[in-house]
Amino acid sequence: MKLDENEIKRRLGEIEGWSYENNKLKKTFKFKNFYESVEFVRKIQPIADEMDHHPDLCVYYNRVVLELSTHSEGGVTEKDFELAKKINKIQ
């Protein structure tokens, strides 16, 4: 079930470093180089597969930008918060 904007903003404190923009949770992770950026994405893959919930992402030389939303619900759901928490534990 899609969470309303007030609920999302209230819960942002649960997921350090994430923001709420354009109906998505968003975070930029910074790294030393491209290799570290790609390794980070590789660590996300099994978590996303296990949850059957995959982030939108952009990989740059020394950073990865992640956006989370549940397309079938048209916005942010509990599943997005759960995935954000798991991703935060990687780094």
Swiss-Prot record:
<protein>
    <recommendedName>
        <fullName>Putative pterin-4-alpha-carbinolamine dehydratase</fullName>
        <ecNumber>4.2.1.96</ecNumber>
    </recommendedName>
</protein>
<dbReference type="Pfam" id="PF01329">
    <property type="entry name" value="Pterin_4a"/>
</dbReference>
<comment type="similarity">
    <text>Belongs to the pterin-4-alpha-carbinolamine dehydratase family.</text>
</comment>
<dbReference type="GO" id="GO:0006729">
    <property type="term" value="P:tetrahydrobiopterin biosynthetic process"/>
</dbReference>
<keyword id="KW-0456">Lyase</keyword>
<dbReference type="GO" id="GO:0008124">
    <property type="term" value="F:4-alpha-hydroxytetrahydrobiopterin dehydratase activity"/>
</dbReference>
<dbReference type="InterPro" id="IPR001533">
    <property type="entry name" value="Pterin_deHydtase"/>
</dbReference>
<dbReference type="InterPro" id="IPR036428">
    <property type="entry name" value="PCD_sf"/>
</dbReference>
